[in-house]
């Protein structure tokens, strides 16, 4: 669906206000957080109403969402156990599986998380 123009500050302000129930009611936020488990091949990812939940062995639960298209990736995550936010926009992205997607989705995120939490 594309079409949203933003930056890391706006994404942070939006996600923080959402997680603190400043944008919607607490009951609506609870509905968004009522997640369902994905198929076995995505065992660490769950989805709610517009929110994605990722379980990381070291850093715990991440709540947020990401998006990508050819040449661009953005992600906005909240780590409630650490009360920390990870938000980035980069000029690299692909919509197909492969080494570039893995580099961005796994290696890049892991490098940032290790600096953020260690």
Task: Describe each model-derived feature in a short phrase.
Residues 1-118:
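Catalytic loop of the DD-peptidase/beta-lactamase superfamily, centered on the K-T-G motif
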């Amino acid at each position: 669906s594309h079409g949203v123009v933003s930056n890391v500050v706006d994404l942070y302000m939006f996600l923080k206000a959402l997680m603190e129930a400043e944008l919607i009611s607490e009951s609506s936020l609870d509905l968004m957080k009522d997640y369902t488990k994905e198929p076995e091949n995505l065992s660490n990812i769950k989805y709610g109403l517009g929110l994605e939940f990722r379980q990381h062995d070291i850093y715990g639960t991440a709540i947020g969402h990401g998006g990508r298209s050819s040449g661009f990736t953005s992600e906005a995550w909240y780590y409630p156990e650490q009360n920390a936010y990870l938000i980035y926009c980069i000029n690299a992205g692909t919509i197909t599986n492969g080494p570039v997607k893995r580099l961005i989705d796994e290696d890049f995120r892991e490098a940032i998380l290790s600096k953020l939490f260690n």
